[in-house]
């Protein structure tokens, strides 16, 4: 699955942020500016994205776990859909501090989530008062929202695929602390430090986000299929 220059142009991948919001560390990936908006060098993006896809393919071939991270509203839905499509994992609402670095505690919360799911299906809730049922349903909903995308992960992931490096800086820092590879879309306002596989590109436009995630999920899904 190769991504072409035409695909990226059509999706608006080259449009960065307003020049006044730029991060100077992104200078090597900027082509120029137009109407006070930075234009990203798509030749570099194409090379770096296709290399990232190649590396993600290698991880999935060895049955590695890839965690998709995109908690801002514009990315939330497609992050979940893409991860499910290629049988991987996701965090698409709030990133809970310690989600990776405090995995032992997170595992206990996942166990609680699974216990509540069982209780809601095995008749346990029928034996409780309405108030107790309501409290447990609220807890279940909250846990599902936060941990639903990682409840079957079982252990720490081998890599993170992040849509917005600036917005998800806590997740990136945690991955760095644990030596987990980070693949990320990095816009002109973001700090690329801590990202192992930088993909310079627009991280706001829905069409651009769709392009990235469609390519990534297809590469991984193909390998997951080939294992069967």
Curated annotation (Swiss-Prot):
Question: Which Gene Ontology BP terms does the record give?
Answer: translation
Q: What keywords are assigned to this protein?
A: Ribonucleoprotein, Ribosomal protein
Record has Ribosomal protein as a keyword? yes
Q: Which InterPro entries match?
A: Ribosomal_uS2, Ribosomal_uS2_bac/mit/plastid, Ribosomal_uS2_CS, Ribosomal_uS2_flav_dom_sf
Q: What GO CC terms are in its UniProt record?
A: cytosolic small ribosomal subunit
Molecular function GO labels = structural constituent of ribosome
Tell me which NCBIfam families the record gives: rpsB_bact
Query: What family is it from?
Result: Belongs to the universal ribosomal protein uS2 family.
List the HAMAP family.
Answer: Ribosomal_uS2_B
**Name of protein:** Small ribosomal subunit protein uS2
Organism of origin is Buchnera aphidicola subsp. Baizongia pistaciae (strain Bp)
> The organism's lineage?
Bacteria, Pseudomonadati, Pseudomonadota, Gammaproteobacteria, Enterobacterales
Q: Which gene encodes it?
A: rpsB
